[in-house]
């Protein structure tokens, strides 16, 4: 038993709810996280274990098209499947929630506004992929082309093979994966997160993590070595969290930005729920604002930069929130 219990936040990757869970989902992130959380409870630490369903990702809209229904119906249908599965397997989540809650939307918009007030957001016009055939702007998963930096075929604005970021317009031989048509580009305005302003702080912070797994640390430093670029955090879509500024009513916040905020929004939701036996509505701050607390993120390897680069930048830019203690991937 520890003389002084530690506050341990266990953050488990949020799955896209576009289908049923399989053994890989359970064994990959969730089982190790559950074992870890149970161990820390056994030795007397104050553990908060949270996760939830990522309801706003493109895979959800793709599945909705396949089933000839709405993204909301798909998101709710498979959220229940995932939630019920975790209950049946007796996982010890303090809260398994979803990104469709009002609390999550409010938390995301609050951090968006804080970043904006602190000067870390910027409006830009850019050329974005568009399908004339389907008469719609195309999100990352809907375009495929040749990487401008290596021979690979890739989707979106980042190559998984070489790890480099780029603008979609830099891809060669582009096609729409929706209708297999040639992709054109149209000018549209978006809000960008000024990631280069966090480069120095992130580099120093990551290098200080002497206990991180080498794969996690090396991939993160490699990401930084390529040089951070401004990243759009809004998209021309109608499914997701609304952008809290005028002139963006027809756009939504990009899922990679809002999903990683889910760990914070879930902590706040839990604190306000009947499951919080202390009934202190602000008890979430003991995990998020107390510098002695430790955050552990259980992720797949493809999610490393979102939790070592993107999330820390958001947390640094919007307030004095605790950064990840360890990213387990």
Task: Please describe what each predicted stretch is.
Residues 2-51, 103-106, 172-329:
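Structured secondary-structure scaffolds
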Residues 2-205:
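N-terminal, positively charged nucleic-acid-binding surface of large information/translation enzymes
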């Amino acid at each position: 038993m520890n003389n002084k219990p530690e506050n341990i936040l266990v953050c488990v990757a949020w799955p896209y709810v576009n289908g049923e869970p399989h053994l890989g989902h359970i064994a990959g992130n969730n089982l190790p996280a559950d074992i870890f959380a149970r161990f820390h409870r056994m030795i007397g630490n104050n553990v908060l274990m949270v996760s939830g369903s990522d309801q706003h990702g493109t895979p959800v809209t793709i599945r909705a098209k396949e089933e000839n229904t709405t993204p909301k119906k798909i998101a709710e249908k498979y959220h229940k499947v995932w939630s019920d599965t975790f209950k049946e397997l007796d996982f010890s989540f303090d809260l398994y929630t979803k990104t469709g809650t009002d609390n999550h939307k409010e938390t995301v918009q609050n951090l968006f506004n804080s970043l904006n007030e602190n000067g870390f957001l910027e409006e830009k016009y850019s050329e974005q992929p568009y399908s004339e055939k389907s008469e719609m702007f195309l999100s990352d998963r809907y375009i495929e082309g040749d990487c401008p930096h290596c021979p690979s075929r890739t989707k979106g604005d980042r190559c998984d093979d070489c790890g480099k970021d780029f603008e979609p317009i830099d891809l060669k031989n582009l096609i729409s994966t929706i209708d297999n048509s040639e992709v054109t580009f149209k000018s549209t305005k978006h809000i960008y997160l000024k990631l280069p302003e966090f480069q120095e702080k992130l580099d120093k912070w990551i290098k200080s993590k002497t206990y991180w797994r080498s794969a996690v640390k090396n991939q993160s430093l490699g990401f930084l070595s390529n040089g951070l670029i401004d990243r759009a955090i809004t998209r021309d879509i109608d499914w997701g969290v609304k952008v809290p500024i005028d002139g963006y009513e027809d756009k939504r916040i990009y899922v990679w930005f809002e999903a990683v905020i889910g760990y914070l929004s879930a902590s706040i939701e839990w604190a306000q729920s009947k499951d919080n036996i202390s009934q202190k509505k602000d008890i979430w701050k003991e995990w998020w604002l107390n510098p002695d607390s430790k955050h552990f993120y259980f992720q797949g390897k493809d999610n490393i930069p979102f939790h070592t680069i993107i999330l820390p930048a958001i947390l640094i830019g919007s307030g004095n929130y605790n950064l990840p203690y360890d990213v387990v991937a």
